[in-house]
Each structure stands twice: as structure tokens, then as C-alpha cells.
């Protein structure tokens, strides 16, 4: 009888302990997705690449810009977008890459509307780095993020850039305009990017929608 009581108590204690463990996991507080809109990121053709670094405590979109030579996530110049992973494409005057896979960033472009991208696919693959002569995001009309009709550069519909940063955070980016102040049907001031983004400030978590 005593043995049965002891066994019963052990089972009850085990169940209670397991339940408490579950509660601890369930009460983990996750930071909310950070959504932002960057207007007029000026990255003219022939200038330096403008580098962005996504960090857990983003204050304003403008705070994304970094001057670090090799601690950056994504960079823009003209219509070209590069990632801090792989090797230089050969376009000239590119920033240094991290060169170590664990602290590199990874990038891809999905054939999906920005709002429909709720989780990033697995990006940690060398296929999602830049290569010599070939940036991961093609800088070619109709193949990357834009269409060029010879007069006007337009972001392609249903294209979303996904990024895993050098610090293992996930971001999605939706291009809105390539012209200053995002004015419709203007070509007066090109290379002024406007885009929306969603950034998950929780380390290693690839969901991109609350």
C-alpha cells in the first residue's frame, strides 16, 4: 500500500513539474514585429553603396544607415542591391563582406505580395549570397525587384525581399518607389528608394507577421 502511495505521489509531482515547465515556456514574452517605411533613401548610381544594418532597437528608419565597412546587412546603389555575404560582384567600389558564414547576411526575393509573406524561408545557404558578376538580387529589368521601360523604373508587383541579418534577425522589404518623395510618374530625381519593411527583433525567429 505504501509503495502504491509513493508511486502515485511521484507521478503527481512529475505531472506538476511538467506543467510548470510548459507554463514557463508559454509565458516567454516576444517582442512585437517592427514595421517601418523608409522614404528617400538616396543611393545614386556612381556613388558609394548605402549600407543598412537592422538592429533589435531600431528607433527610426533613418537609424538603419551604417558607415561600418563590413558590419552591414544590405546595401543599395542605383538599382543594384547587394548583401553582406559571398564575394564582391565586380561592380566597383563595393563594401567589404563579412567572409564568415555565421556572421554573414543572406537574401532572397520571393514572388509574393509583401502582406502575404508571414514567415521567411530558410535562407542560410550560399545560394543566397552574392557571387562574382552575379548579385543574388538580379540587377536586370524584370528579373529582380524592378521593371525598366526605358523611361521609368517601377517596382515589380508581388515581389518581396527577405533577409537574414548578420546578427540572425529576419526582415522583409517591399519596394514602393525609386523616385524622390515617391511621386507618381516622375523621373526627375531617381535613386531615391522608398520601401516598407517588417523586422522581427526576436533572435533567430523567422516569422514576419504578428
Give the ranges of each region predicted by the language model.
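C-terminal motif of bacterial Sec signal peptides marking the signal peptidase cleavage site
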Residues: 15-19
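Sec-dependent N-terminal signal peptides
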Residues: 5-14
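Glycine-centered tight beta-turn/hairpin loop motif at sheet-sheet or coil-to-beta transitions
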Residues: 166-170
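Short coil-to-beta strand junction motifs in C2/discoidin
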Residues: 188-193
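A short beta-strand micro-motif
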Residues: 161-165
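Short beta-strand-centered aromatic/proline hotspots
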Residues: 172-177
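N-terminal secretory signal peptides that target proteins for export/translocation
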Residues: 1-2
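N-terminal "domain-start" segment
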Residues: 21-159, 181-184, 197-210
